[in-house]
């Protein structure tokens, strides 16, 4: 009998679909990258999704984030994502956390309950804490490196953190992983050189902040706000979603 996952089953088979339906994945960061990862996982039939993000949809998110529309501005991203997931498949179990993941909040999560962890957050301290906790729990993790200030979505690669180049965030993560004797870390990164944003005081977030009321981490406190677009972060998020699905089912690509 056909269902909404019939076309995916044609590629993966029934056993793999059952594996996906029985899997639980945590996505940390529901923004330009993580939002599209969630979309891919939900449409692929992952049975349980944990969404972690304390941010609200801002008008400036409309250029790239799948959770952002005029109607959702001011709403929590995890709430918007949960509704979207249930519009896709009401049977997916969704757990939301309005939490900014840091070393101080990390103990609120039991990483042994996840089949896979996705890091799509944008602070080094949070990213490395997330990696350490996942590694300690023996839970597979994939991390997004920098997707801002870039224009070419074809430059993304999936590799180990120690094989990365060009990306400034990856360079910092390599150093932090070495300090903690982390031997391997799967990442998605871009080999495209980082662009320098075209500064314009008339659209400066620091001078004209429009973060929704109640936003905990306003752009006024950020050292810099990277340029972004609709077609680079989204591709990174979809690549990550694909890697998670393939890893969960043990997909072996055809040679040739």
Please name every model-derived segment.
Residues 60-67, 149-160:
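Acidic/polar active-site rim loop that often engages polyanionic ligands
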Residues 98-106:
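Conserved SAM/SAH-binding loop
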Residues 46, 51-89:
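Glycine-rich phosphate-binding loop and adjoining beta1-alpha1-beta2 segment
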Residues 2, 112-113, 126, 136, ...:
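Glycine-rich phosphate/adenylate-binding loop
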Residues 27-29, 52:
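Conserved N-terminal Rossmann-fold NAD(P)-binding element of oxidoreductases
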Residues 33-34:
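Hydrophobic/small residue at the entry helix of a nucleotide-binding pocket
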Residues 1-26:
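N-terminal charged helix/coil linker that caps or initiates catalytic domains
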């Amino acid at each position: 009998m056909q269902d909404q996952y019939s076309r995916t089953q044609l590629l993966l088979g029934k056993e793999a679909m059952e594996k996906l339906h029985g899997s639980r994945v945590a996505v940390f960061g529901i923004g330009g990258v993580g939002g599209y990862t969630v979309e891919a996982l939900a449409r692929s039939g992952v049975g349980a999704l944990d969404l972690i993000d304390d941010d609200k949809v801002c008008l400036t998110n409309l250029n790239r984030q799948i959770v952002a529309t005029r109607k959702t501005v001011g709403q929590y991203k995890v709430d918007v994502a949960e509704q979207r997931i249930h519009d896709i498949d009401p049977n997916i179990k969704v757990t939301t956390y309005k939490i900014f993941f840091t070393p101080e909040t990390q103990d609120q999560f039991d990483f042994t309950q996840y089949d896979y962890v996705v890091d799509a957050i944008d602070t080094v301290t949070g990213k490395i804490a997330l990696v350490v906790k996942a590694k300690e729990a023996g839970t597979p993790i994939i991390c997004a490196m920098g997707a801002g200030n870039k224009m070419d979505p074809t430059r993304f690669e999936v590799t180990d953190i120690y094989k990365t180049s060009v990306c400034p965030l990856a360079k910092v993560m390599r150093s932090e992983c070495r300090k903690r004797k982390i031997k391997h870390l799967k990442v998605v990164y871009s080999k495209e050189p980082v662009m320098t944003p075209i500064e314009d005081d008339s659209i400066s977030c620091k001078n004209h902040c429009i973060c929704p009321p109640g936003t905990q981490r306003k752009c006024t406190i950020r050292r810099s706000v990277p340029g972004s677009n609709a077609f680079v972060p989204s591709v990174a998020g979809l690549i990550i979603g694909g890697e998670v699905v393939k890893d969960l089912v043990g997909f072996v690509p055809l040679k040739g």
